[in-house]
Amino acid sequence: MASIQDLYETVSRVLGNQAGKVISALGEITVECLPEHYISVMTALRDHEELHFELLVDLCGVDYSTYKNEAWQGKRFAVVSQLLSVKNNQRIRVRVWVSDDDFPVVESVVDIYNSADWYEREAFDMYGIMFNNHPDLRRILTDYGFVGHPFRKDFPISGYVEMRYDEEQKRVIYQPVTIEPREITPRIVREENYGGQ
């Protein structure tokens, strides 16, 4: 198994300027790329004989609209993929920043990694990130009539509608949420108050 530094150098050399940034931090390698290079970066990571990242272990969306309790200045959405090379016993992360915050779209990697199918559907369902050329991009965790994307940071915690069984209609119905929205402020305990002093 090669070291993290060796992997960093190999990835930087193989991807060249297709990788916007190659970051080595906390014992991990992260490749950040632009949407127009996403497919070529993922293909190179899978097919290059020195890398051979043949497994997509995970793919998820991320909403950076507020990050570290402050307003985020960059792009709002990213798609993050975790790749594994069984042959080399190495892992790598690929982050692609989605260009449009209002209508986030990125290319699908289903043709490169079959396992991306349901992961991309989940990112679409939860974050509203569209994946071009996905064979079956539809909701996977929420109802077909669900409004909004619940993992977006601007989605209300209680949601917009609730469902319940209506005895008169003998079916499940949707109705506006009856929970009063409120701000929850945590109680702060200072050290000087420890121990009942």
UniProtKB/Swiss-Prot annotation:
Oligomeric form and interacting partners: NDH-1 is composed of 14 different subunits. Subunits NuoB, C, D, E, F, and G constitute the peripheral sector of the complex.
Function: NDH-1 shuttles electrons from NADH, via FMN and iron-sulfur (Fe-S) centers, to quinones in the respiratory chain. The immediate electron acceptor for the enzyme in this species is believed to be ubiquinone. Couples the redox reaction to proton translocation (for every two electrons transferred, four hydrogen ions are translocated across the cytoplasmic membrane), and thus conserves the redox energy in a proton gradient.
A GO MF label: quinone binding
Keyword Lyase assigned: no
Location relative to the cell: Cell inner membrane
Keywords tagged on the record: Cell inner membrane, Cell membrane, Membrane, NAD, Quinone, Translocase, Transport, Ubiquinone
InterPro entries associated with the record: NADH_DH_suC, NADH_quin_OxRdtase_su_C/D-like, NADH_UbQ_OxRdtase_30kDa_su, NADH_UbQ_OxRdtase_CS
Signal peptide annotation: none
Protein name: NADH-quinone oxidoreductase subunit C
Record gene name: nuoC
Chaperone listed as a keyword: no
Organism lineage: Bacteria, Pseudomonadati, Pseudomonadota, Betaproteobacteria, Neisseriales
Pfam families to which the protein is assigned, alphabetical: Complex1_30kDa
E.C. no: 7.1.1.-
Membership in a protein family: Belongs to the complex I 30 kDa subunit family.
HAMAP family: NDH1_NuoC
NCBIfam families: NuoC_fam, PRK06074.1-1
Catalysed reaction, written as an equation: a quinone + NADH + 5 H(+)(in) = a quinol + NAD(+) + 4 H(+)(out)
UniProt topology in membrane: Peripheral membrane protein
Entry-linked SUPFAM superfamilies: Nqo5-like
Assigned GO CC terms: plasma membrane
